[in-house]
A protein has these predicted regions:
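Conserved beta-alpha
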Residues: 75-129
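N-terminal glycine-rich anion-binding loop in soluble enzyme alpha/beta folds
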Residues: 1-38, 105-106, 110-144
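Short hydrophobic segments within beta-strands
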Residues: 16, 97-98, 170
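N-terminal glycine-rich "phosphate-gripper" loop used for MgATP/nucleotide binding
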Residues: 49-65, 164-173
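Short, acidic/small-residue loops that bind anionic groups at enzyme active sites
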Residues: 5-8, 68-89, 122-123, 183-198
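Short, well-structured alpha-helical segments in soluble
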Residues: 34-49, 150-164
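Short, flexible loop segments at boundaries between secondary-structure elements
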Residues: 127-130, 188-208
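A C-terminal functional module that forms or caps the active site or interfaces directly
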Residues: 136, 149-193
Length: 220
């Protein structure tokens, strides 16, 4: 915001941070109903505080995005929307995706991207296990190691060999581990792109459009 407006300006924010330990317990039990209700309640608190736009700053919880979005009367910006717009602008249609097991296996992000002309390529089972474990056992606890970085690089390299044109960092913690130049293809960080789009909304008041590719199915 300051970079665009100048001076001493900053983004006016209302933040509601949930206890991830509770969320992790619900995730381990597959209790998405509890997660949905809890996040709907938090969204309503933000709306009551005067928020003009709400962002769910996590990829995994977007499995219940639609339920949360319909529970409030202000717009919500899907975390994948700015990433899809960036991929479309770059002319990319087939990309590797790394995230939690839920994001990689449950299909909700796969469908969201595919409907907009982007095919997500997921790691194999061993790769998904490794990516997920590093997120939950290390990154969410602030642990960043070179060993885990190499594992991620190998997983991405395998997907690039299969035709991935870029990699989507589909978990907000992965940017702690990987930086531009760590892999051979462009990286698109959902967290960073989400923040940029929200910053633009704060500056100009224009809600980002929902990118829809002219070819709404991608079966390549």
């Amino acid at each position: 915001v300051r970079a665009n407006v100048g001076g001493q300006h900053s983004a006016p924010l209302t933040l509601d941070s949930v206890d991830f330990a509770q969320m992790a317990q619900w995730l381990s039990r597959g209790d998405w109903a509890e997660i949905s209700v809890a996040l709907q309640n938090r969204a309503k608190v933000l709306e009551a505080s005067g928020a003009q736009c709400i962002a769910l700053c996590t990829n995994t919880m977007h499995k219940v995005f639609d339920e949360i979005a319909t529970s409030v009367n202000v717009p919500m910006l899907h975390i994948a929307t700015p990433t899809i717009a960036a991929l479309q602008a770059a002319g990319l249609t087939k990309v590797a995706f790394l995230g939690t097991r839920y994001s990689m296996e449950d299909g909700f992000l796969d469908v969201y991207f595919n409907e907009r002309g982007i095919r997500l390529m997921m790691p194999d089972l061993a790769g998904r296990d490794a990516v997920h474990s590093i997120i939950f056992d290390e990154l969410v606890c602030g642990v960043v190691t070179d060993t885990s970085r190499v594992i991620y690089q190998r997983v991405i390299a395998d997907l690039v060999e299969q035709g991935a044109q870029a990699v989507v960092l589909g978990c907000t913690e992965i940017c702690l581990l990987l930086s531009n130049g760590d892999v051979a293809v462009p990286m698109f960080d959902t967290a960073s792109l989400h923040i940029q789009a929200l910053g633009a909304f704060t500056v100009d008041g224009i809600f980002p459009s929902n990118p829809i590719d002219s070819n709404t199915s991608n079966t390549d």
